[in-house]
From Swiss-Prot:
Compositionally biased tracts (Basic and acidic residues): 281-296
Protein name: N-acetylglucosamine-1-phosphotransferase subunit gamma
Subunit description: Homodimer; disulfide-linked. Hexamer of two alpha (GNPTAB), two beta (GNPTAB) and two gamma (GNPTG) subunits; disulfide-linked. The alpha and/or the beta subunits of the enzyme constitute the catalytic subunits.
The keyword Secreted is annotated on this UniProt entry: yes
Pfam family, one: PRKCSH
Amino acid sequence: MAAGLARLLLLLGLSAGGPAPAGAAKMKVVEEPNAFGVNNPFLPQASRLQAKRDPSPVSGPVHLFRLSGKCFSLVESTYKYEFCPFHNVTQHEQTFRWNAYSGILGIWHEWEIANNTFTGMWMRDGDACRSRSRQSKVELACGKSNRLAHVSEPSTCVYALTFETPLVCHPHALLVYPTLPEALQRQWDQVEQDLADELITPQGHEKLLRTLFEDAGYLKTPEENEPTQLEGGPDSLGFETLENCRKAHKELSKEIKRLKGLLTQHGIPYTRPTETSNLEHLGHETPRAKSPEQLRGDPGLRGSL
Ligand SMILES: *[C@@H]1O[C@H](CO)[C@@H](O)[C@H](O)[C@H]1NC(C)=O
Ligand SMILES: *[C@@H]1O[C@H](CO)[C@@H](O)[C@H](O)[C@H]1NC(C)=O
């Protein structure tokens, strides 16, 4: 340790004497494996990571529960990825740099369900990435042994993992219905019956099934998702509140009034907008129906429209 420090001071001293930029000294020092950082064998990497919240409870097909508490890793180029089913996904840079990146790519959150099938495990609320949190979707695929087979980043800070396991090779291994308590199965039966009897629409059917999966604990309710969604930024506010709707409506009404004014001013007849589709009619067809000469001699109208 003392020798290392002496060497560090020597290197700093040398670089201070020469014209080398500050970065040069840094580069030399990091070649030495050091005792301060991530690679300290006495300080396990994982203990340095601070999870934002606890993972969701273990849920889904019972035969997968035995994976809970285990971890599977994959080294790809300079990173080691680690998937701990029903717990987390982490990433560890494999270098001797003192500030090697180690991070949480997601904490077990909820299942993805499609077509009566568990199609993926969502791990969310990972380390910050710009204004969002890193998140990972883990697909379960049939394989000879348990292994993390593939990792990619299809969009920024959203990771896609493939985990192979013999536990999902049976064609019914990931079906949702058999995992449900009987009461929820009866509810599901009723929902299907109502759809068949056309008492509910396909959209209503989707919505009822979603609620049912939330009750089972497979999906999180929108309130439970809120922290993640809010991190999506101001854009995600949209029409969520009545206040926003009123504002948007007021602005659209003003715009319609302005456009109508333009049409009137130029003697172009228009139909009263009763539906949104009429806006298009107003914008394109009516002027086209007029003699083209009138429009051509009127650049002001075209520019404004
Ligand atoms: C990830 O999950 C594993 C397995 O349960 C656990 O030992 C580890 O502490 C977790 N890591 C983080 C950063 O929460
Ligand atoms: C839905 O799942 C069934 C098996 O459960 C399968 O036969 C069918 O092809 C799937 N449909 C779609 C659209 O994925």
